[in-house]
């Protein structure tokens, strides 16, 4: 199974038509697949909180948005998540590469990994962690849940 294609197929099947991304080596294949799809308008962001603002605008314009980002920027997005996305009950699937776990080659990534899940839990953001390739089978139902309950949802990869 091509995971990048499966993720993108699930986005399209759930009418996600706007995706913003921050450069990410771990999710580069997904980003490339999204860029190749005519059904998805892809706009790169400079920063994660900027991307969330773009997603909010897309949502207000009638689109179903998603963001692809790194967990190391969760701290930067707290205010935007709380004061914009959560306050206005905007559904936002957040596909987040989870840096800083075992075998992480960059030491500074480890510090944010220690806080990522706790910050998401403190904000009452439903969080799912894909540990194996088979976990991607859950992505479709997670997207459905996100749009049904009008909440941001974190999917850690």
Region locations from a protein language model:
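Thiamine diphosphate
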Residues: 1-157
């Amino acid at each position: 199974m091509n995971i990048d294609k499966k993720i993108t197929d699930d986005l399209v099947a759930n009418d996600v038509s706007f995706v913003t991304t921050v450069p990410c080596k771990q999710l580069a294949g997904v980003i490339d697949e999204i860029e190749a799809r005519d059904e998805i308008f892809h706009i790169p962001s400079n920063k994660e909180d900027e991307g969330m603002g773009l997603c909010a605008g897309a949502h207000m314009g009638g689109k179903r948005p998603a963001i692809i980002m790194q967990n190391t920027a969760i701290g930067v997005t707290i205010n935007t998540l709380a004061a914009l996305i959560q306050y206005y009950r905007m559904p936002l699937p957040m596909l987040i590469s989870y840096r800083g776990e075992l075998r992480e080659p960059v030491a500074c990534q480890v510090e944010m990994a220690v806080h990522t899940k706790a910050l998401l839990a403190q904000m009452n953001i439903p969080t799912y962690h894909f540990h194996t390739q088979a976990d991607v089978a859950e992505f479709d139902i997670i997207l459905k849940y996100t749009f049904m309950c009008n909440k941001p949802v974190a999917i850690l990869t």
